Amino acid sequence: MTTGKTAPRRLSIFGSTGSIGRNTLNVVEHLGGRDNFEISVLTGNGNVELLARQAKASGARLAVTASDRHYDSLKSALSGSGIAVASGKSGLMEAADCEADWVMAAIVGTAGLAPTLAAARRGADIALANKECLVSAGDLFLKSIREGGGRLLPVDSEHNAIFQVLEENQRHAVERVVLTASGGPFRTASLKEMADVTVETARAHPNWSMGLKISIDSASMFNKALEMIEARHLFGLTPDQIEVILHPQSIIHSMVGYTDGSVLAQLGAPDMRTAIGYALSFPRRPNLPIERLDFARLARLDFEAPDEVRFPALRLARLAMTRGGVQGAVLNGAKEVALEAFIAGRLSFLAMADITERVMDDLAHLPPAAEMDDVFSADSQARQRASQLMKLDLVG
């Protein structure tokens, strides 16, 4: 006689030690933990101690550090646990091959591309938090999803909001999508004030708790620029259908406008667990301990148009979408080098966009990507050119 109890759902979390990964494990625990879920793989990078703790607590089958030099430390930390250990690029590909019904793709940067594409081709549902999959390799990634037969579930709060309110049978009637942005710590800063921005002031996001790089990307609005490109691929939009509005309270996460004048919006407290929980439970809605909105206390919601002189990243996103091809990969690669230079104190805050635009112009001749090697080549060329420009002191 059967009990009727369903088998635990198999999950893999790529990037479990980051903010998205930690919140994913938190959601899993709130939704029943090991009673309802089986963790196949956890991957991290240098935070071996946290990765080992997570693997033991969740009962993961495999723990992977993306850095080969941390393999011995992870192996030692998990000695006697029965949890397999792997490292480096080969370890990440091993993680992608492990059986899992649902994969959280939260590895930051191009390092997340290959394992996420491999998991997609295998047919897993992909909860996508890695931006490079769509920004750098959108067409190829979507092809992998189609060929594998799994679902693509956006985890970025803005895209998840659109996903929640986009009526599948009314896609033909979509007129526009509106991505909201808090404006970050420099929403009201002057151009002169932004010229003197430091890493510490740039990382202080008013609403969201995030890692260093994504906090600075949010401050420069490069994060929103990447989200614009992602939205185009995710929802089959033209560049003209994508708008950005500043909304400092971060309560409305995005809106969809229809041809009859209706606008549907998703509202909620700024908590990543909402989007993660929806992606994990889709098409059902989970019961999560998220702060409920008190509209009487909230009282008001503010909006304003973004200033693309102070935040040129938005203009660069439209330029990349208009040019097409590998310009998304070029934008992202150049931006990454400029961001690292800013963090290291070698480049000013405003010069990040200048460097990125110069590289985009210099590499505008590159052909569209026919395979992933073309994407990696465009990314590599963009990074090399950005480094060259900074060495020549052409900007900043």
From Swiss-Prot:
Residues annotated for Mn(2+) binding in this entry: D156, E158, E227
Q: Which Cys-Cys disulphide bridges does the record give? A: none
On whether NADP is a keyword of this UniProt record, the answer is: yes
Name its pathway.
Isoprenoid biosynthesis; isopentenyl diphosphate biosynthesis via DXP pathway; isopentenyl diphosphate from 1-deoxy-D-xylulose 5-phosphate: step 1/6
User: Which prosthetic group or cofactor does it need?
Assistant: Mg(2+); Mn(2+)
Q: Which InterPro entries match?
A: DXP_reductoisomerase (IPR003821), DXP_reductoisomerase_C (IPR013644), DXP_reductoisomerase_N (IPR013512), DXPR_C (IPR026877), DXPR_C_sf (IPR036169), NAD(P)-bd_dom_sf (IPR036291)
Look up the domain of life of the source.
Bacteria
MF terms from GO for this chain are: 1-deoxy-D-xylulose-5-phosphate reductoisomerase activity; manganese ion binding; NADPH binding
Binding of NADPH occurs at: T17, G18, S19, I20, N47, N130, E132, G211
Q: What are the record keywords, sorted?
A: Isoprene biosynthesis, Manganese, Metal-binding, NADP, Oxidoreductase
Enzyme Commission number(s) from the entry: 1.1.1.267
Q: Which Gene3D superfamilies match?
A: 1.10.1740.10, NAD(P)-binding Rossmann-like Domain
Q: Which reaction does it catalyse?
A: 2-C-methyl-D-erythritol 4-phosphate + NADP(+) = 1-deoxy-D-xylulose 5-phosphate + NADPH + H(+)
Q: Which residues bind 1-deoxy-D-xylulose 5-phosphate?
A: K131, S157, E158, S182, H205, S218, N223, K224, E227
Tell me its family.
Belongs to the DXR family.
Q: Which HAMAP family has this protein been placed in?
A: DXP_reductoisom (MF_00183)
Protein task:
Catalyzes the NADPH-dependent rearrangement and reduction of 1-deoxy-D-xylulose-5-phosphate (DXP) to 2-C-methyl-D-erythritol 4-phosphate (MEP).
Protein name, entry field: 1-deoxy-D-xylulose 5-phosphate reductoisomerase
Organism name: Rhizobium etli (strain CIAT 652)
Gene designation: dxr
